Swiss-Prot record:
This is Casein kinase I homolog 3. InterPro entries: CK1_Ser-Thr_kinase, Kinase-like_dom_sf, Prot_kinase_dom, Ser/Thr_kinase_AS. It comes from Saccharomyces cerevisiae (strain ATCC 204508 / S288c). The YXXZ (Tyr-Xaa-Xaa-Zaa, where Zaa is a hydrophobic residue) motif mediates the targeting to the lysosomal compartments. Changing I447N: Impaired vacuolar targeting. It is an enzyme of class 2 (transferase).
């Protein structure tokens, strides 16, 4: 990143490099600390992790005036989870022009990437070792009074990343906080995280029903499908679905079709409910411990404390009974003749967990919401990353953002009315979609909590049913980037005109409206 102009410097001393992803929040770039060594920005207590000069980082850009800002709450989550193993460090949060930016550790490919590179199936050994790490990460999040609410392979990344030098050589390195373990699994993208209990009193949030959906349909729990308030049990059940996905290559509820999305996701939920976990074992080709895991997660009460050690012991039992050892050797280490994954040979790591769409596009523009017409694709060079992100925001702002003007909300109301009758999932009203304007500030320290933040501790004395309609703070939908146009207007037209929907149940819900986040158009 030599000869950088001042337009490419953010946060005083972070140089913005190439774009590496895009998602529901905006756009992400690779960056570099160019000034001096510094510590993670984690509140009043400085973190022990130090980012060295010339250390690579990931820089997220998000328009400041979005309807549902994500990066501020994501930074709050990183502050809460500061010091936990497998959680990236947040080095900076602030504002640059018309954008919020968040700077965190640069990480490697997601488990979804590695899963594809390994032929869309993990061995029992790799799945057990990965499962133990994933359970540990979720336990750490729960111990800090948060629930994740969007468990999926895309949001788990390994520590080792690879970069190509100007000379064309592959440079391998690990995140600054990984202790040089290239296969340490990280959790990222806390845009849907929420406090499930008061950090001081440990009082659990109350059980509620008729909640809007949030999460990824392929992996979400049965209770989430039926509109029940999520808690720790739902994160663990979603993990169980991910484990079977790794072992089987797919899940039985993938590929279901229905006349509309409401019926499709109800059908997915009913299929999950009807199938016994033992039916997922492929005639005992999969160790029974995975069925035991899923049964246990589904048997938990709403506010019950899970036994994480028991769940990890199930994975150890599966290894032992199959004469396998947890030796740290994963399937992806055998790629390319035992040399492991390589950024030049394998598809470039797409950093799912940072929020960008799965790049596996099969040409179905209606389903994937991606305009692949070469005549309309924008290939004009962009001067700076910030201008690129701003152009994306301006395009999407004029086409698909929810307007606060009731007169311009007619089409959105039409979409909501289409799925509302006799629905177990009650969409929010237009009045509940409006978020109060938050004061803008230059640094995080002056940002105060608002009622809409999922990180406001629950207080029983102020419990209000109306608040439950507004307690989610989920990603916005505005990522038309320079080289990929995502046309949400055509998606809405498709939903209204087409009588058969795709089988892409790996969609992430925004609980405010029945509309896709752009990070969810993943092929099945």
């Amino acid at each position: 990143m030599s000869q950088r102009s001042s337009q490419h410097i953010v946060g005083i001393h972070y140089a913005v490099g190439p774009k590496i992803g895009e998602g529901s929040f905006g756009v992400i770039f690779e960056g570099e600390n160019i000034l001096h060594s510094c510590q993670a920005q984690t509140g009043s207590k400085r973190d022990s992790s130090i980012i060295m000069a010339n250390e690579p980082v990931a820089i997220k850009f998000e328009p400041r005036h979005s309807d549902a800002p994500q990066l501020r709450d994501e930074f709050r989550a990183y502050r809460i989870l500061n010091g936990c193993v497998g959680i990236p460090h947040a080095y900076y949060f602030g504002q640059e022009g018309m954008h919020n930016i968040l700077i965190i550790d640069l990480l490697g490919p997601s488990l979804e990437d590695l899963f594809e590179w390994c032929g869309r199936k993990f061995s029992v050994k790799t799945t057990c070792m990965v499962a133990k790490q994933m359970i540990d990460r979720v336990r750490a999040i729960h111990d800090h009074d948060l629930i994740y609410r969007d468990i999926k392979p895309d949001n788990f990344l390994i520590s080792q990343y690879q970069r190509i030098s100007p000379e064309g050589k592959v440079i391998k390195s690990c995140a600054s906080s990984s202790n040089n373990d290239p296969n340490l699994i990280y959790m990222v993208d806390f845009g849907m995280a929420k406090q499930y209990r008061d950090p001081r009193t440990k009082q659990h949030i109350p059980y509620r029903e008729r909640k809007s959906l949030s999460g990824t349909a392929r992996y979400m729990s049965i209770n989430t499908h039926f509109g029940r308030e999520q808690s720790r049990r739902d994160d663990l059940e979603s993990l169980g679905h991910v484990f079977f996905y790794f072992l089987r290559g797919s899940l039985p509820w993938q590929g279901l079709k229905a006349p509309n999305n409401k019926l499709k996701y109800e059908k997915i939920g009913m299929t999950k409910q009807k199938l016994n976990p033992d039916d997922l074992l492929l005639n005992n080709a999969i160790p029974y411990q995975f069925a035991t895991y899923l049964k246990y997660a589904r048997s938990l009460k709403f506010d019950e404390d899970p036994d994480y050690d028991y769940l990890i012991s199930l994975m150890d039992d599966a290894l032992r009974l199959n004469d396998l050892k947890d030796d740290g050797h994963y399937d992806w280490m055998d790629l390319n003749g035992g040399k492991g994954w390589n950024i030049k040979i394998n598809r470039r790591a797409n950093l799912h967990g940072y929020g960008n769409p799965n790049p596996r596009v099969n040409g179905n523009t209606a389903r994937n919401n991606v305009n692949t017409n070469s005549k309309t694709r924008n290939t004009t060079p962009v001067a700076t990353p910030k201008q690129q992100a701003q152009n994306s925001y301006n395009k999407d702002n004029s086409k698909s953002r929810i307007s606060s003007n009731p007169q311009s909300f007619t089409k959105q109301q039409h979409v909501l009315k289409k799925i509302e009758p006799n629905s177990k999932y009650i969409p929010e009203t237009h009045s509940n979609l409006q978020r109060p304007i938050k004061s803008q500030s230059q640094t995080y320290d002056s940002i105060s909590h608002t009622q809409n933040s999922p990180f406001v501790p629950y207080s029983s004395s102020k419990a209000n049913p109306k608040r439950s309609n507004n307690e989610h703070n989920l990603p916005n939908h505005y990522t038309n980037l320079a080289n990929k146009n995502i046309n949400y207007q055509s998606q809405r037209n498709y939903e209204q005109e087409n009588d058969a929907y795709s089988d892409d149940e790996n969609d992430t819900f925004c609980s405010k409206i029945y509309k896709y986040c752009c990070c969810c158009f993943c092929c099945c």
